[in-house]
């Protein structure tokens, strides 16, 4: 796993040429559920307007862009790591593994992979060119698209989990460590879907 410093605007422009994939993750901070990553290859001949960091978009806008990405992108792949894998590996290494899985799931090998953040996972294909771009989800459209796909996929999984366990409020807080989530943990206990290595969950288990 390599660590990279911020690249320049000129470098960003150069990287966004040719057949490349953008990669981003969602769900490192929550106490429950998978960490989800996405890899997206956009079609330069079929642009998508309004792409941005998923956190800066409304849910309605994200959902609309998600459908447009699936319809227009050349390739979309989702990778994930389960709570069990997160507990075994730690969240950083689980995120890197999920990114590896997303890239491996692409139908065609890209010329390079551009990843939001300052780390690049060790790809199985050692010849694959990888670049970390700090705040890339707001700079590079393919990374923005990946952030939107990962966010919508994970949010919908939290909504499905909320249907199974409405007392935890997952549809509202999406599994993040909010006051409501802490209160639900205290009142109802730890679920199989919780990340047992995360401190609030671990402390609740130890208190039993």
Swiss-Prot record:
One of its GO terms (biological process) is mismatch repair. This is Ribonuclease HII. Its cofactor is Mn(2+); Mg(2+). One of its GO terms (molecular function) is RNA-DNA hybrid ribonuclease activity. It holds the Pfam family RNase_HII. It is found in: Cytoplasm. A divalent metal cation binds at residues 24-25, 116. The gene is rnhB. Manganese or magnesium. Binds 1 divalent metal ion per monomer in the absence of substrate. May bind a second metal ion after substrate binding. Residues 18-208 form the RNase H type-2 domain. Belongs to the RNase HII family. It catalyses: Endonucleolytic cleavage to 5'-phosphomonoester. Keywords: Cytoplasm, Endonuclease, Hydrolase, Manganese, Metal-binding, Nuclease. It comes from the Bacteria. PROSITE patterns: RNASE_H_2. InterPro entries: RNase_HII, RNase_HII/HIII, RNase_HII/HIII_dom, RNaseH-like_sf, RNaseH_sf. Its EC number is 3.1.26.4. It comes from Shewanella loihica (strain ATCC BAA-1088 / PV-4). Its main location: cytoplasm. Endonuclease that specifically degrades the RNA of RNA-DNA hybrids. GO terms for cellular component: cytoplasm; ribonuclease H2 complex.
């Amino acid at each position: 796993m390599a660590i990279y410093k911020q690249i320049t605007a000129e470098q960003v422009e150069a990287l966004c040429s040719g057949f490349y994939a953008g990669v981003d993750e969602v769900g490192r901070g929550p106490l429950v559920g998978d960490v989800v990553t996405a890899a997206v290859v956009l079609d330069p001949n079929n642009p998508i307007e309004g792409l941005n960091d998923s956190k800066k978009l409304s849910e309605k806008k994200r959902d609309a862009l998600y459908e447009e990405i699936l319809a227009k992108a050349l390739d979309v792949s989702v990778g994930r790591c389960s709570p069990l894998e997160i507990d075994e590996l730690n969240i950083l290494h689980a995120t890197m593994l999920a990114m590896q899985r997303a890239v491996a799931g692409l139908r065609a090998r890209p010329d390079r992979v551009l990843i939001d953040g300052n780390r690049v996972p060790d790809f199985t294909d050692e010849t694959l060119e990888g670049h970390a771009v700090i705040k890339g989800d707001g700079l590079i459209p393919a990374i923005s698209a990946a952030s939107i796909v990962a966010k919508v996929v994970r949010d919908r999984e939290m909504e499905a989990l909320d249907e199974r366990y409405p007392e935890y409020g997952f549809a509202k807080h999406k599994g993040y460590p909010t006051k409501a989530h802490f209160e639900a943990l205290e009142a109802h206990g730890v679920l199989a879907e919780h990340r047992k290595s995360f401190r609030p969950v671990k402390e609740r288990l130890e208190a039993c």
